[in-house]
């Protein structure tokens, strides 16, 4: 549950007639494997479900729980609260695939804020970073990124706009109506 949203079920919130989670799943529709960390729920697309250990341990624990199911060379790591992420997916994939030295490509907002949960990883780099943070309860995602060479993918369009507050959710709903 999202603390800044009063404990609301963030992935289940509706933007543009779809849940936040379904909007993110639409963005990765072509993926061979789609893994979602969190409690099971109905989704518009079939996914593999995993739970972080312990439940509620945070994004790194969720990423670790799902990482073993991925067989592709590149792994997208996307938060469930990114309703406009679809157009960013090719940019993220292209950035990490086009730079042999890079382990991860992350969206960077116009303000300069890096969105570590809007990222494309070389799967080998992600697994190595997860090994470095293993056993660290509540490790921040930036700790994973710090263990790898990162490419910044500018996001002037706001594709990585996330919904952490009610005002941000209202903004996402307004964007979806345009």
What are the roles of these predicted feature ranges?
Residues 1-138, 146-159, 166-170, 177:
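Nucleotide and nucleotide-moiety/phosphate-recognizing core
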């Amino acid at each position: 549950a999202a603390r800044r949203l009063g404990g609301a079920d963030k992935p289940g919130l509706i933007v543009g007639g779809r849940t936040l989670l379904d909007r993110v799943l639409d963005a990765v529709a072509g993926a061979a494997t789609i893994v979602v960390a969190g409690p099971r729920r109905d989704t518009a697309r079939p996914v593999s479900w995993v739970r972080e250990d312990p439940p509620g341990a945070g994004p790194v624990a969720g990423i670790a729980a799902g990482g073993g199911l991925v067989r592709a060379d590149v792994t997208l790591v996307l938060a469930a609260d990114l309703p406009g992420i679809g157009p960013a997916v090719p940019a993220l994939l292209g950035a990490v695939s086009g730079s042999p030295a890079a382990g991860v490509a992350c969206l960077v907002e116009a303000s300069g804020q890096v969105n570590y949960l809007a990222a494309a990883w070389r799967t080998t780099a992600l697994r190595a970073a997860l090994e470095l943070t293993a056993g660290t309860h509540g490790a921040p995602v930036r700790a994973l990124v710090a263990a790898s060479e990162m490419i910044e993918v500018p996001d002037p369009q706001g594709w990585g706009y996330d919904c952490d507050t009610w005002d941000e959710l209202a903004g996402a709903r307004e964007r979806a109506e345009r």
